[in-house]
Amino acid sequence: MEDFVRQCFNPMIVELAEKAMKEYGEDPKIETNKFAAICTHLEVCFMYSDFHFIDERGESIIVESGDPNALLKHRFEIIEGRDRTMAWTVVNSICNTTGVEKPKFLPDLYDYKENRFIEIGVTRREVHIYYLEKANKIKSEKTHIHIFSFTGEEMATKADYTLDEESRARIKTRLFTIRQEMASRGLWDSFRQSERGEETIEERFEITGTMRRLADQSLPPNFSSLENFRAYVDGFEPNGCIEGKLSQMSKEVNARIEPFLKTTPRPLRLPDGPPCSQRSKFLLMDALKLSIENPSHEGEGIPLYDAIKCMKTFFGWKEPNIIKPHEKGINPNYLLVWKQVLAELQDIENEEKIPKTKNMKKTSQLKWALGENMAPEKVDFEDCKDVSDLKQYDSDEPEPRSLASWIQSEFNKACELTDSSWIELDEIGEDVAPIEHIASMRRNYFTAEVSHCRATEYIMKGVYINTALLNASCAAMDDFQLIPMISKCRTKEGRRKTNLYGFIIKGRSHLRNDTDVVNFVSMEFSLTDPRLEPHKWEKYCVLEIGDMLLRTAIGQVSRPMFLYVRTNGTSKIKMKWGMEMRRCLLQSLQQIESMIEAESSVKEKDMTKEFFESKSETWPIGESPKGVEEGSIGKVCRTLLAKSVFNSLYASPQLEGFSAESRRLLLIVQALGDNLEPGTFDLGGLYEAIEECLINDPWVLLNASWFNSFLTHALR
């Protein structure tokens, strides 16, 4: 049948029929009878309109050939065969210019002589049965119905056949020929029996009573009735031409669509100012761990016990001193806080039984560092509403900061492999279905690529710190509890390892609302000298607290050990998300999975194994000033994971805004790359929306600079 259709009908008709079927998700190769029926219907519509014109006097005439210069207008507007968007646009335009009532369903033709829409039917059954089904479906007095059959019968509204005898005879002859051609190939019986009746289900519920009144009350402005609004919505098809849509939406909108060319976009303007500073809740690439392997001490797994054990592995402690003060803080207090921690840990060891938790003495330095009694006193509004000069604090605008190189280094480091594994493969039961087998295989491959990644260490560190802090905030609201910063991993040889990064002391934490803040002081070990990039450490006071012997190629060297101390704060909602940082693994796995799916659908088989095991293939990882960076599939996994982790570590309103707004510009640039000839209006407004998010956040500034690299290369 498919071959017959392609031989029997004009290629333009065949192409239109294929498009129509695809629009409704149907396959011409499978539903061949439907394919033939659509082609037949299209051909009848075109034959109905052929040769019929209206002359300058408004008379209907038939012209088969003749003076091409005669001022003739086609008598029929063909609606059938256009895509839905365009078809509704034509119908709306006809209704607006002629005042004809808008039909509920798309008709096939419009007759400019009789000023009416026409619904054409071609049936393999009895014409009167089909006529009644059509009439019952469209329920419109105004639309004229004209039915033809393959046996030469016809039926039309009020027996008004619109066309002259000869034109209709041409159509009937063509239908009869199609029937004979099908019969001679043995296709007719199947075609005749495959016709289904028109859907006669009422497409609209009648709304009455209270619901009707509510509907009328809740109409958008400028709509007089529900019918009026419905007709507008039915005719409003997405992805049409933008100007038309805008003018349909509002009379006030007057947008000029500007073509978006390779020369149109400019780079994003990054702010000037001092370099941006580190703002994560804990150190990332600069962190130093004191570790114990195969821990088996008494109380193993109790954080305080583990922390003391880790501290004992280090012998190079010395009298601490400040080497990089905090600009605004009382630096001696930070020094005293560290000394207090050392002293109180010593006290614990002197006790007979080590307690499971340690609450610090509320010394003046700790009260200062944790902002105790600093919050202005809350007063009931009733008591102060008569105060004449009651006003909110003036808050300063954030100072713009420029992009600094350290954030790119942080990101690069997060993509690297460490020599330990940070996640265990969960024990999941046997696979039952084949899809589970594929899912397990993908998960195992992905885990193998990211389990040793530094970003995965950050996830586990973040989960631990946030869980411990939230627990302490709820369990010891008034106490200044000491919380060790701990993580656990496995070495290459499979030995368990417990690591201590430093300590947190939390302040008072009566957290009623999700956004109520708990203050904490963090003290973290590091080998990084803060004087190398002082701008990165603006918010920290850094002490030198010891000397560490390191094994290197040239033997042992001694390096100073630093303690990075700062006051910080977080909230219940931030801690909740911090505890769920493992989701980053899932997000990046899903991104990889969509890449595998794309590959599999091209090859029409599951490509998981080939995808992960192909050593030769490289994949695009990201943009840099040098061009598109490429790497192995493992590198892609780790880069996607690092992006997801940094989105969590550096979450902020600036990032939310930048991601949402820059995505719109990205889609336009991609459309240009796909030769879709995008057009824009108010591109300046879009740039403004993106650039107002570029203030001082290191991760947002880095993403903006990547975006500029992408623009440069995408527009070459």
Swiss-Prot record:
Keyword field: Cap snatching, Endonuclease, Eukaryotic host gene expression shutoff by virus, Eukaryotic host transcription shutoff by virus, Host cytoplasm, Host gene expression shutoff by virus, Host nucleus, Host-virus interaction, Hydrolase, Inhibition of host RNA polymerase II by virus, Manganese, Metal-binding, Nuclease, Phosphoprotein
Descriptive protein name: Polymerase acidic protein
UniProt cofactor(s): Mn(2+)
Organism: Influenza A virus (strain A/Guinea fowl/Hong Kong/38/2002 H5N1 genotype X0)
Motif (Nuclear localization signal 1 (NLS1)): 124-139
Family designation: Belongs to the influenza viruses PA family.
Keyword Nucleotide-binding among UniProt keywords: no
A GO term, aspect molecular function: RNA binding
Cysteine pairings via disulfide bonds: none
GO biological process, one term: symbiont-mediated suppression of host gene expression
UniProt keyword Ribonucleoprotein present: no
Motif mapping: Nuclear localization signal 2 (NLS2): 184-247
Subcellular location: Host cytoplasm; Host nucleus
One Gene Ontology cellular component annotation held by this UniProt entry: host cell nucleus
Comment on bound cofactor: Binds 2 manganese ions per subunit.
The protein's assembly and partners: Influenza RNA polymerase is composed of three subunits: PB1, PB2 and PA. Interacts (via C-terminus) with PB1 (via N-terminus).
Residues reported in the UniProt entry to bind Mn(2+) 2: E80, D108
Function: Plays an essential role in viral RNA transcription and replication by forming the heterotrimeric polymerase complex together with PB1 and PB2 subunits. The complex transcribes viral mRNAs by using a unique mechanism called cap-snatching. It consists in the hijacking and cleavage of host capped pre-mRNAs. These short capped RNAs are then used as primers for viral mRNAs. The PB2 subunit is responsible for the binding of the 5' cap of cellular pre-mRNAs which are subsequently cleaved after 10-13 nucleotides by the PA subunit that carries the endonuclease activity.
Annotated binding of Mn(2+) 1, by residue: H41, D108, E119, I120
Modification note: Phosphorylated on serines and threonines by host kinases, including human casein kinase II.
Enzyme Commission no: 3.1.-.-
A Pfam family recorded for this sequence: Flu_PA
